[in-house]
Curated annotation (Swiss-Prot):
Residues 252-350 are annotated as: alpha/beta subdomain. The CBM6 domain binds the non-reducing ends of beta-glucan; this domain may therefore target the enzyme to polysaccharide termini in damaged regions of the plant cell wall susceptible to catalytic attack. It comes from Halalkalibacterium halodurans (strain ATCC BAA-125 / DSM 18197 / FERM 7344 / JCM 9153 / C-125) (Bacillus halodurans). This is Glucan endo-1,3-beta-D-glucosidase. The active site is at D466, E542, E546. It holds the Pfam family Glyco_hydro81C. Belongs to the glycosyl hydrolase 81 family. SMART domains: CBD_IV (SM00606).
């Protein structure tokens, strides 16, 4: 008996050594630290849930992937071209400016021209849609076959794909990409055929090169190698015996443009790489888009013509500006694309920082907040799937740091303890017996190269949908645990499985298990939520904010675990997606949405349309708030454009008719707090306590993924901190800056084990102890005294020659009104600096007095340095001469504070750009608030302070005098002689109140006679 006991003990030791706690004993599971994932599809435990919809979700993606032998390993999903891999041919794809579709007969090519686009309001449903037509301008076919058997993915890179249509030996390989106005076609066992429903107008015929227009005036070119001439001119079918052709979408019917496109028509793009860097010292994310081409004829250049989206050309690096083809423009669903030629171009964006939570700076009732925290312990998951459970653990991860701040350390550990229990369950694929579980596990599908969580939801398994949304919540929970327990987060413990989930939705290049950046489109700048994209409108994404939530959580997790490469990759994704959201979801610059489109947000962005509707209903709040939730320490980008925040809020309030929000009231309050926290507090206090303990069936006041505690904490913090200030950056990634009435607050969190000193771009610095927020506001000016004599007033004209430093410019006497000097001899890259410009309030525009006898250029307004934060820009035209002066206007986003302002000049290096005489900033409520233009003058009212306005009159011909006639609230008429300043006449009116109505007119002298204007009305 003793010998047998020894043998049994030895066997138990072997088992323990082979399968330590948390490791997998199943041959169908792979151990990762203390966790594991399944490699065999599990037998799903439905837990008594018989709903067919739920059961249908618990499957796998399609077994068949349409790809050639050239494409091996993990398969790219969630792309704009994804349907090519899962359809026998494909659904519509949107490689802007084209839309294309593979069919049995060939490739259908279409350009969704502006006249095809429609804005449709469904008033009964409460939805809006911006959509184009689905059609065919012509079909690219193969001379050797009338019908192909299938289309497959033959190759792909960061933004191009090669589709292969095949029927035995008859093959047609088609290379096309988003942002490419070319389609490259290569033939096997046959040659080119272009088929039209109506014969095209061939307006340029040069043998192997033709320019043609469709019956509805869309302009194209077709290129074959020299010596291979086109046939069938005048008919509905054009043919060419070449085994290679290129199709180009021309911006206009223009022979010179056709010649430019011919230069690159024989340079087939074989690779395209978006290579990015993050400069931690400056917060700059630089992305270089580069192509590698193969010459189809001798001498073809290694380059192409790109079509840039607004989010790209708005942030184009100065080194790439001279490559722009400004007149080469395409109008698409996302606004205007602009052409650029070359091998590469570069964009520069500014990373604004994220936080693990807001700090403990709110003026709140701490006992009340603690009560809300304890109330939240009664909350529970609203589902067993990766999304509903994800929302629950995301909620717990938000509550834990607030509990820490309130000194409720046991409660904070209770929240984190529950997070650990849930994650550790899900991160193990096997049960205590070593067998695969039937739920609460992750399974690796080798066919596609993806991790699938069960229970699944929203087609996260069957279509590979929403992985960044769902798994982002798991990473949020892990990041909060790691903030307090670094041991738990180590790879040999549970961190390895968290890293695996992250790799699934944002893997690096050359990952053995997963495709590169599964969810993200480097060229379009946004994520795509659908894995397969089998829709006629292409791929789509609804909750852009949950994408930003995912990138935020990876930044926090990577910073907590010391993974700098992962952190920087997430910063690239966060910063780039932010720029796309501002354009295509919010239209903060008011240049994307058509004028007839009513809402201030697009809820779902598609390749081929834009929807103001959700996937599940048409609730008014949901159509906005699905692109806000969940609020967290990375949500501060939502407040970067306060003018837009106010527009969106007011449009939502107007649509509902009151502040009695129909659902998710707390999300509206939290959004409102970005610009008007006092109003947000009033709304919150009026109804937050009408919500008792957690009730998932009642989301009118509190959305199920949030809590009263977080809502109360968030709004009170913003009431004390003020507005988010993105104009100041830091040399550390976990930070935020706020500005309240000109006083900045600097927030930093330090995940490391040592104290750090963080430098800000405005000269401020902060020391932060390990594993904590900073205490106090650090060193450096945060609230400069406006009375200091050396401060410059941006709302009065600043003479250009009164600079504090410059590079490259000279001064000369000016003929402009007022005399004095102007600056001139300005070339690309020159700049002037104006120190200590003090903005007492937001500025939204700048006026610059300019003259130019060349095509002009652009003036960038930056702070801190010539390459500092970009606040706005102004386009300068040819004015007709070096002393022919015009006033040009541009938009800026400047919050209160004191800055060193730089005017940086951009344009062609081949000539002098412009002269500048003066510039002036306009505050919100100035400039366009009340302005009237007449051939003789521009006149109106600009706001100055809370109780003052300036009435201005700018005559087009010099006036010897201007009088203003004024009535306030229909009172006695007052008459004043106005004061002339550099050709513009002004009169300040004081002691006004909100709601006052001003009626005013002018009498002015012009070349001897005097004239009187009509009366104008302005309401305060």
């Amino acid at each position: 008996m003793k010998g047998k006991n020894v043998q049994l003990l030895f066997a138990l030791v072997v088992i323990i050594l082979l399968f330590p706690t948390g490791a997998s004993a199943s041959p169908h599971a792979v151990s990762v630290g203390k966790g594991s994932y399944a490699t065999e599809f599990p037998e799903i435990d439905f837990g008594g849930i018989n709903d067919p919809g739920f059961r249908d979700q618990q499957g796998e993606p399609p077994a068949t992937i349409y790809r050639s032998d050239r494409v091996t390993g993990p398969m790219q999903t969630n792309s704009w071209w994804g349907s090519l891999a899962v359809d026998r041919f494909s659904m519509n794809q949107y490689p802007h400016p084209f839309s294309v579709r593979h069919r049995a007969e060939g490739l259908h090519v279409f350009y969704d021209a502006p006249h095809n686009m429609v804005v449709h309001e469904n008033r009964e449903a409460g939805t809006w849609h911006i959509h184009g037509a689905i059609g065919t301008d012509f079909t690219i076919k193969h001379s050797g076959t009338a019908n192909f058997e299938q289309a497959v993915v033959d190759d792909y890179n960061d933004w191009y794909v090669r589709g292969l249509l095949e029927n035995g030996a008859h093959q047609m390989a088609i290379t096309y990409g988003v942002g490419s106005p070319y389609i490259f076609v290569e033939y096997e066992d046959g040659s080119a055929v272009l088929d039209f429903d109506i014969a095209p107008d061939v307006w340029e015929m040069n043998g192997h090169v033709i320019g043609f227009s469709t019956h509805d005036h869309k302009h194209y070119a077709a290129f074959a190698p020299p010596g291979q001439n086109w046939s069938g001119i005048g008919s509905k079918t054009l043919t060419n015996n070449a085994d290679y052709i290129a199709i180009a979408k021309l911006p206009e019917k223009d022979g010179n443009m056709l010649a430019k496109f011919e230069q690159y028509a024989y340079s087939v793009v074989r690779d395209a790489v978006a290579d990015w860097t993050y400069d931690e010292a400056t917060g700059t994310v630089t992305t270089t888009f580069e192509v590698t081409t193969e010459a189809k004829v001798q001498g073809a250049p290694d380059g192409t013509i790109f079509a840039l989206y607004p989010h790209q050309y708005r942030h184009l690096a100065s080194s790439s500006e001279n490559q722009l083809l400004q007149n080469y423009q395409y109008e698409i669903i996302r606004g205007t694309m602009i052409g650029l030629e070359g091998k590469r171009f570069t964009t520069e964006l500014t990373y604004p920082g994220v936080l693990p939570s807001l700090p403990d700076l709110g003026d709140y009732d701490r006992e009340r907040l603690i009560g809300y925290l304890h109330d939240a312990t009664s909350d529970y998951p609203t589902g067993s799937d990766t999304y509903e459970l994800g929302k629950y653990i995301g909620k717990l991860a938000t509550l834990a740091p607030i509990a820490d701040q309130m000194g409720e350390y046991e409660l904070a550990e209770q929240f984190r303890g529950e997070l650990k229990d849930i994650l550790e369950d899900w991160l193990q694929a096997t049960n205590a017996s070593g067998q695969l579980k039937g739920k609460n596990l992750f399974y690796y599908n080798e066919n596609w190269g993806t991790i699938l969580g069960y229970h699944a939801a929203h087609s996260s398994a069957t279509r590979i949908n929403d992985h960044h949304f769902h798994y982002g919540y798991f990473v949020k929970a892990a990041a909060e645990i790691a903030r307090a327990d670094q041991e738990w987060a180590k790879s040999e413990n549970w961190g390895g499985m968290i890293d695996l989930l992250i790799r699934d939705f944002m893997a690096d290049r050359d990952d053995d298990l997963f495709p590169y950046l599964r969810m993200f489109d480097p060229y379009s700048g946004n994520s795509w939520a659908d894995g397969l994209a089998t829709f006629d409108a292409g791929n789509n994404q609804e909750s852009s904010s949950e994408a930003m939530h995912a990138w935020t959580n990876v930044i926090l997790w990577a910073e907590a675990t010391g993974n700098k490469a992962l952190r920087d990759r997430a910063i690239y994704l966060y910063t780039t997606e932010m720029s796309a959201i501002n354009e295509y979801f919010f239209d903060v610059h008011q240049e994307i949405f058509p004028e007839e489109y009513g809402p201030e947000i697009v809820t779902i962005n598609w390749g081929g349309k834009m929807d103001h509707a959700t996937w599940w209903n048409s609730g008014k709040v949901e159509k906005y708030a699905i692109n806000w939730l969940p609020f967290h320490g990375g949500s501060l980008y939502l407040g970067h454009h306060p003018d837009y925040v106010d527009r969106a809020y007011e449009e939502l309030r107007r649509d509902i008719g009151s502040t009695d929000w129909n659902l998710w009231s707390n999300l509206v309050w939290m959004y409102r707090a970005f610009t008007n926290p006092d109003d947000a507090l009033q709304q919150m206090e009026a109804s937050i306590d009408d919500y008792g303990l957690f009730d998932p069936g009642n989301e009118k006041i509190i959305e199920r993924g949030s809590t009263k505690a977080q809502t109360y904490h968030w709004i009170h913090n913003l009431a004390e901190l003020g507005r988010v200030d993105p104009t100041v950056t830091a040399n550390h990634p976990i930070y935020a800056v706020f500005n309240k009435n000109g006083n900045r607050t600097y927030i930093v969190y330090n995940f490391s084990d040592s104290p750090i000193t963080v430098q800000f771009s405005d000269g401020h610095s902060i020391q932060v102890e390990p594993h904590s927020f900073n205490i106090g506001n650090g060193d450096g000016p945060t609230n400069p005294d406006p009375s200091e004599p050396d401060l410059k007033n941006p709302y009065e004209r600043i003479q250009a020659e009164a600079y504090d430093a410059m590079s490259g410019i000279q001064t000369e006497g000016t003929d402009d009104d007022g005399g004095g000097d102007n600056i001139g001899w300005i070339n690309d890259g020159d700049w002037v600096k104006y120190e200590r410009v003090h903005f007492e309030r937001d500025a939204s525009s700048i006026e610059v007095r300019v003259a130019s006898d060349t095509p002009g250029g652009r003036i960038e307004i930056r702070t801190g340095s010539p390459t500092g934060t970009l606040l706005g820009d102004v386009q300068v035209p040819n004015t007709g001469g070096w002393q022919q002066w015009q006033t040009v206007t541009g938009n800026v986003q400047i919050q209160p504070g004191t800055y060193d302002v730089y005017l940086v000049f951009k344009g062609s290096p081949e000539y002098d750009l412009m002269n500048v005489n003066w510039f002036v900033f306009r505050a919100n409520g100035q400039g366009n608030g009340d302005s009237h233009t007449h051939p003789d003058y521009t006149a109106g009212i600009r706001g100055i302070t809370g109780n003052e306005v300036t009435i201005f009159f700018a005559p087009t011909t010099e006036a010897r005098y201007v009088d203003v006639h004024l009535k306030v609230n229909n009172g006695q008429q007052l008459n004043y002689r106005m004061t002339e300043r550099n050709g513009e006449w002004e009169r300040v009116v004081e002691n006004l109140s909100s709601g006052d109505v001003l009626e005013y007119s002018f009498t002015y002298e012009k070349l001897g006679p005097q004239y009187t204007t009509e009366w104008f009305t302005y309401s305060r």
